[in-house]
């Protein structure tokens, strides 16, 4: 596991209370470990971090997209706080290298588990908020999410249409969407869709197939824009 100092440099933030940082990176599997004395893991911080992230992203969009209506802003926010985007932020921070977990969880692929990365990223946001204030947290989130907010200029009307137009302009076949996973009860399912254009592919999740397709298209457009 890498030094927390490296993570703090990536965040451009140094924790006053290091225990908050440790809690934000402590996987729930530790609670079943007989040598683990503390009863804290990142689940409570994740709960708070989810709310803080939604608040900050909402305010960023409100300030920067003055001409967009409520429905449009909600769609953009849905992308910015979805699992894929949060995990891409976590990947930028190489967060998987810092999560504290049991050997069994690690052997089972816990470091590459997207749920773990998403949860730890949200918990980290909460830890920063509790260690500092909303203004500092706002600045850090705005910096970490800047490239994903910027890509909205390309996808603001419909990411599926934007991806189709890119494919046609590049003389590629039209995008192909495929449902690869459905999780949860029938009334609250989460769908995962894979979109492929030529040799490029990306996944997206949502509570409806169309939402998952749009999030997959957004993620692929973001990748294409940065390649």
Curated annotation (Swiss-Prot):
Cofactor entry: Mg(2+)
Q: Write out the GO cellular component annotations.
A: cytoplasm
Q: Where is the signal peptide?
A: none
Q: Which residues bind Mg(2+)?
A: 46, 119, 122
What SUPFAM superfamilies does the record point to?
Answer: dsRNA-binding domain-like, RNase III domain-like
Residues of the RNase III domain: 4-133
- What is an example of a GO molecular function annotated in this UniProt entry? double-stranded RNA binding
Q: What is its main location?
A: cytoplasm
Localization per record: Cytoplasm
The UniProt catalytic activity note for this protein reads: Endonucleolytic cleavage to 5'-phosphomonoester
Subunit-structure text: Homodimer.
Cite the PANTHER family for this sequence.
RIBONUCLEASE 3 (PTHR11207:SF0), RIBONUCLEASE III (PTHR11207)
Which family does this protein fall into?
Answer: Belongs to the ribonuclease III family.
Function of this protein? Digests double-stranded RNA. Involved in the processing of primary rRNA transcript to yield the immediate precursors to the large and small rRNAs (23S and 16S). Processes some mRNAs, and tRNAs when they are encoded in the rRNA operon. Processes pre-crRNA and tracrRNA of type II CRISPR loci if present in the organism.
What is the protein's given name? Answer: Ribonuclease 3
């Amino acid at each position: 596991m890498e030094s927390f100092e490296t993570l703090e440099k990536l965040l451009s933030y140094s924790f006053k209370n290091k225990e908050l940082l440790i809690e934000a990176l402590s996987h729930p599997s530790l609670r079943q470990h007989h040598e683990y004395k503390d009863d804290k893991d990142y689940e409570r911080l994740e709960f708070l971090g989810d709310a803080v992230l939604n608040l900050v992203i909402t305010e960023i969009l409100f300030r920067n997209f003055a001409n967009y209506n409520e429905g449009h802003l909600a769609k953009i926010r849905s992308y910015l706080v979805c699992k894929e985007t949060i995990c891409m932020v976590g990947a930028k921070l190489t967060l998987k290298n810092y999560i504290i977990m049991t050997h069994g969880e690690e052997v089972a692929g816990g470091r590459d588990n997207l749920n773990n990365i998403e949860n730890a990223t949200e918990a980290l946001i909460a830890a920063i908020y509790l260690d500092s204030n909303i203004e500092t947290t706002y600045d850090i989130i705005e910096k970490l999410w800047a490239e994903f907010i910027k890509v909205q200029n390309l996808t603001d009307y419909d990411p599926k249409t934007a991806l189709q137009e890119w494919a046609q302009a590049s003389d590629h076949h039209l995008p192909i969407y495929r449902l690869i996973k459905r999780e949860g009860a029938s009334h609250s399912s989460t769908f995962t869709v894979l979109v492929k254009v030529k040799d490029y592919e990306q996944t997206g999740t949502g509570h409806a197939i169309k939402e998952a397709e749009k999030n997959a298209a957004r993620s692929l457009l973001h990748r294409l824009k940065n390649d």
